[in-house]
A protein has these predicted regions:
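Phosphate- and other anionic-substrate recognition elements at nucleic-acid/protein interfaces
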Residues: 1-132
Length: 132
């Protein structure tokens, strides 16, 4: 985000080497994200909420988030899903985000963007609105 709205919304391709969980696969994932945060003033990340479930993919995301935070060149703020969207279903969350974006912002979102990309946009918007 900048003063004009969303700069970019994109999807990072799933890394099949992740299944090996070797150090080079994890590094490749962090490097894929790091190049887009190097000039950031602030990073806002969704963290896992503890609701008793253990989801391997969610744990993987937490590991990558931890590595990104470790390399972050700026302040990092985290929110749980409960904090920023409550129990809202994915489809409703995406529809609300799209409804609230300008046509110019919508054009900056990759057409292949998944719910994860829209969650990232939603978390950023939540933080900006909370701190206005």
């Amino acid at each position: 985000f900048d003063e004009k709205g969303i700069l970019q919304g994109a999807y990072t391709v799933h890394n099949p080497d992740r299944l090996n969980r070797n150090v080079w696969a994890w590094r490749a994932m962090v490097d894929a994200v790091y190049s887009s945060i190097i000039a950031a003033d602030l990073i806002v990340i969704e963290t896992m909420q503890n609701d008793g479930r253990v989801i391997t993919d969610a744990l993987d995301v937490q590991i990558v988030c931890g590595m990104i935070i470790g390399r972050a060149p700026c302040e990092v703020i985290t929110y749980t899903p409960r904090q920023w969207k409550g129990q809202t279903p994915k489809a409703v969350t995406i529809a609300r985000i799209k409804r609230d974006l300008t046509p110019a912002e919508l054009d900056r979102i990759d057409k292949k963007a998944t719910h994860d990309a829209y969650d990232a946009i939603g978390i950023g918007r939540y933080h900006l609105n909370k701190n206005d």
